[in-house]
A protein has these predicted regions:
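Metal-dependent nucleotide-binding catalytic modules
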Residues: 3-146
């Protein structure tokens, strides 16, 4: 549900998929996926998703996760942040997105540029090594859950 803003953006902006693919292609430490959308449309799917979730009266911690799901680098880089509920949701979400290869489906990319920027912070936060995460990813994919 965190990407519920994507179909709404598609409906409103005919060239949205082209911009989204560009956004995933240029994502990294210096540029978030939503920065490209903001430049093109003065809004982005995370903002639209946040307001959709609020209008559905979803809990605040869920709406905050939707709003911030492309702000993971800043959130996980800030060690003073005490918002463990947000970090927990985002950690699970970002690992799931990487395992399910959202960067291929939504961004038409062969590489997960966003994960390359944040993966080490996420895994450190949840206490997983790269090796453990690769095993988890393989297990999930073998179960057909990707």
């Amino acid at each position: 549900f965190h990407d519920c803003g994507v179909p709404l953006m598609l409906k409103r902006f005919p060239d949205y998929m082209t911009v989204l693919e560009e956004a995933y292609g240029s994502a990294g430490p210096e540029q978030r996926v939503v920065d490209t959308e903001n430049r093109a449309f003065n809004t982005n799917h995370a903002v639209v998703g946040y307001y959709t979730a609020k209008s559905w009266r979803l809990p605040e911690h869920v709406t905050n996760a939707i709003a911030n799901h492309h702000n993971a680098l800043a959130i996980f880089s800030d060690e003073s942040s005490r918002n463990s509920q947000l970090k927990n949701l985002l950690a699970i979400l970002k690992m799931a997105e990487h395992i399910c290869a959202s960067y291929r489906v939504l961004g038409n990319q062969v590489e997960d540029h966003e994960w390359n920027s944040i993966g080490h912070l996420i895994l450190d936060y949840v206490g997983l090594s790269d090796y453990d995460f690769e095993n988890l990813k393989e297990t999930v994919r073998e179960l057909g859950a990707h």
